[in-house]
């Protein structure tokens, strides 16, 4: 048998490869009842599950920018940020993998001529790359390209603020799978996503330039499925 491990990949699942004597000096091989998700199925599931964390992780640069606006009293202009994130998905979810994300965003914002300069609007764009490690020699990559628009409202006297963002993504997904017979296989697909986030909080200044910023956030994203 060419299998490098005592298992056989059969579609969605990998089955334990078992054997017994055929009674004539030979060996009979068969697939046992013990099964788990195959590397190829794991890679596809991980790639699709990663899209929301990719989308949300990219917001870290925008949240940093909006925090800067609040700290600097709403000084608008052109900005650029790089960022990095790590996510560990545990086995309890049914699919364990590690995700490492890095990317950059750039944008520009300006105050609206209403509300005494309390409102600002802006646009952003950027790209990120997420590397997935699914163990057993299987990995994946998600390259993301995005554009979006955002607005923020800040009341300087009270410190209350509202942030909102709408972001569109295009994802390039690629899987590198190590099969049970030692052969490596590759696959890729593209899909898109659209999401929005809103945050409400308060910027509370303390002595010596310190501050605290309690907030509540709600976010949602819709990811295009693929057959």
Residue ranges and their predicted role:
Residues 1-34:
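Extracellular, surface-exposed repeat/solenoid domains
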Residues 9, 42, 217-220:
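A generic alpha-helix propensity feature with a strong bias for hydrophobic helices
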Residues 30-212:
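Outer membrane beta-barrel translocator domains of Type V secretion systems
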């Amino acid at each position: 048998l060419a299998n490098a491990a005592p298992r056989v990949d059969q579609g969605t699942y990998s089955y334990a490869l078992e054997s017994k004597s055929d009674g004539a000096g030979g060996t009979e091989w068969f697939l046992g009842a013990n099964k788990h998700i195959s590397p190829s199925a794991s890679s596809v599931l991980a790639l699709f599950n990663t899209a929301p964390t990719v989308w949300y992780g990219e917001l870290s640069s925008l949240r940093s920018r909006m925090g800067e606006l609040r700290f600097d009293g709403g000084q608008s202009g052109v900005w650029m940020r790089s960022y990095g994130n790590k996510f560990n998905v545990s086995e309890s979810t049914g699919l364990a993998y590690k995700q490492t994300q890095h990317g950059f965003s750039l944008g520009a914002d300006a105050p609206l001529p209403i509300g005494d300069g309390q409102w600002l609007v802006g646009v952003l764009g950027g790209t990120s790359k997420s590397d997935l490690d699914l163990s057993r020699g299987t990995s994946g990559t998600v390259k993301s390209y995005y554009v979006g628009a955002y607005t923020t409202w800040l009341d300087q006297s009270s410190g209350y603020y509202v942030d909102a963002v709408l972001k569109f993504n295009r994802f390039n997904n690629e899987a590198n799978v190590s099969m049970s017979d030692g052969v490596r296989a590759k696959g890729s697909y593209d899909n898109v996503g659209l999401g929005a986030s809103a945050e409400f909080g308060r910027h509370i200044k303390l002595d010596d330039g310190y501050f605290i910023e309690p907030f509540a956030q709600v976010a949602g994203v819709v990811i295009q499925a693929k057959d």
